Design a protein with these regions (language model features):
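Conserved small/polar residues in nucleotide/adenosyl-binding loops
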Residues: 257-260
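A short, well-ordered alpha-helix in the C-terminal region of glycosyltransferases
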Residues: 241-254
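Conserved catalytic-core segment of nucleotide-activated headgroup transferases in glycan assembly
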Residues: 73-146
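Active-site and donor-binding regions of nucleotide-sugar-utilizing enzymes
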Residues: 1-74, 93, 97-99, 110-112, ...
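Short active-site oxyanion
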Residues: 33-37, 90-91, 116-117, 155-156, ...
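Catalytic binding pocket for nucleotide-activated donors in carbohydrate/polymer assembly enzymes
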Residues: 35, 165-236
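Donor nucleotide-activated moiety binding/catalytic core segment of transferases
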Residues: 64, 141-183, 187-188
Length: 260
């Protein structure tokens, strides 16, 4: 502001429990008042800001919807992943997973030989990869060590490199988004945009897109193994349910594009 350079906040979202709206949040409210304009995701954010005297606000939606649509349109062709999946296998893609997530879906995977699993853990250091491998009871291969021969002989593909997850979701029948048993879930839209059901843990409340996916019946939140098992059992045996859930997820992701 000393140099008279405009400052904007884009694709912001505000919640009632944030410090800006507390009686002791004056310093933080002053920071918001320094913005020339705030472009927010929803009407609720605009109302909260109005109550603290901030009126330079426009509701424009969430730019991430346009971004994930662009990512889908530019998705990489991954021949080894396609070969691993094969023609008929029910493939479960777990993205940005952490240990507590992995404990649940690996238990299910180990006891269900009819399915295949692609894991793209959030942390891909050697210690975490070894930890994942120690829990597996079925054949696996790391992506960086996969080839046209060994990828046909395994049931689990571990993505041990960055930059592929947003393209990999399209090879799954169902996606699991990690982080819901820790600080909060990761990006649900990257999976939903492919029109597949989305599953995540119980800590999703800070993410409006996750809440709306649940409301649209394009996603389901689970809190323990029994709930995950019941959901995956149904997805594998009720094709209509799986396709309708996926269609709901895809429609939600696409319906909010081009609003920014």
């Amino acid at each position: 502001h000393k140099r008279r350079i405009p400052v904007y906040s884009v694709s912001s979202i505000f919640r009632r429990d944030q410090i800006f709206f507390k009686w002791y949040g004056g310093t933080y409210r002053n920071v918001l008042k320094d913005f020339d304009h705030l472009f927010v995701q929803n009407e609720a954010s605009k109302r909260y800001l109005s109550k603290i005297g901030i009126s330079r606000v426009t509701v424009v939606g969430d730019t991430r919807f346009d971004r994930v649509l662009q990512i889908r349109e530019e998705a990489k062709d991954l021949p080894l992943v396609k070969m691993f999946k094969g023609d008929n296998a029910f493939t479960f893609v777990a993205g940005s997973s952490w240990g507590p997530d992995e404990d649940l879906f690996l238990e299910y995977f180990n006891s269900h030989p009819e399915m295949k699993l692609i894991i793209a853990p959030h942390v891909i250091d050697e210690n975490h990869l070894v930890e994942i491998i120690s829990k597996l009871k079925r054949p696996y291969v790391r992506y960086t060590r996969a080839d046209e021969k060994n990828v046909l002989k395994v049931d689990c593909l571990i993505i041990d490199c960055f930059g592929l997850l947003s393209s990999i979701y399209r090879y799954g029948e169902v996606a699991y988004i990690g982080g819901g048993f820790g600080v909060g879930i990761h990006n649900t839209l990257e999976a939903a945009v492919y029109g597949i059901p989305v599953i995540f843990g119980p800590k999703y409340q800070k993410f409006m897109e996750a809440i709306r996916l649940l409301e649209a019946k394009g996603a389901y939140s689970i809190k323990d193994y029994d709930e995950l098992k019941a959901l995956l059992d149904r997805f594998q045996t009720d094709d209509v349910f799986m396709r309708e859930t996926g269609a709901n997820a895809g429609y939600y992701a696409v319906s909010y594009t081009h609003l920014t």
